[in-house]
UniProtKB/Swiss-Prot annotation:
NDH-1 is composed of 14 different subunits. Subunits NuoB, C, D, E, F, and G constitute the peripheral sector of the complex. It catalyses: a quinone + NADH + 5 H(+)(in) = a quinol + NAD(+) + 4 H(+)(out). GO terms for cellular component: plasma membrane; respiratory chain complex I. InterPro entries: NADH_UbQ_OxRdtase-like_20kDa, NADH_UQ_OxRdtase_20Kd_su. It comes from Francisella philomiragia subsp. philomiragia (strain ATCC 25017 / CCUG 19701 / FSC 153 / O#319-036). Binds 1 [4Fe-4S] cluster. Pfam families: Oxidored_q6 (PF01058). This is NADH-quinone oxidoreductase subunit B. The keyword Nuclease does not apply. One of its GO terms (biological process) is electron transport coupled proton transport. Its cofactor is [4Fe-4S] cluster.
Length: 158
């Protein structure tokens, strides 16, 4: 009816739902353990919280991953390497910023060598607060990322 009105067809809407459902069940993160938050990230991947039940398998290579978890303090010298890892990931890709230091610099905010948030280097989809955030907080952040992926239009033109 109006200029901004978009009608997605049945096939497009169904394919979007199917593709996004499949993506949420097979998130493969590459990890950047920059500080103490990495310990909690490993804790989340261990037996008690078992991220495998969500279809999350940690990958050693960014070329095999679709989620980047930035866990810890990002220093100025590490920023180009983080950007390179992000650029090597295939599309679609998502980023989780884990911990106060990755979110905004944390305790080291006023240090000369710290990037005040990894969102200055790469686009961030989900922020997990805390110093360090618990494994439950990371699991909750991953569930929020899955909800964000489900709501995304994959094939429909905008």
């Amino acid at each position: 009816m109006g200029i901004g009105n978009e009608n997605k067809g049945f096939i497009t809407a169904s394919a979007d739902a199917l593709i996004n459902w499949v993506r949420t069940g097979s998130l493969w993160p590459v990890t950047t353990g920059l500080a103490c938050c990495a310990v909690e990230m490993m804790h989340a991947g261990a037996a008690r919280y078992d991220l495998d039940r969500f279809g999350i398998v940690f990958r050693p290579s960014p070329r095999q991953s679709d989620v980047l978890i930035v866990a810890g303090t990002l220093c100025n010298k590490m920023a180009p390497a983080l950007r390179q890892v992000y650029d090597q990931m295939p599309d679609p890709k998502w980023v989780i910023s884990m911990g106060s230091c990755a979110n905004g610099g944390g305790y080291y905010h006023y240090s000369y060598s710290v990037v005040r948030g990894c969102d200055r280097i790469i686009p961030v989809d989900i922020y997990v607060p805390g110093c360090p955030p618990t494994a439950e907080a990371l699991v909750y952040g991953i569930i929020q990322l899955q909800n964000k992926i489900i709501r995304k239009d994959t094939i429909a033109r905008k």
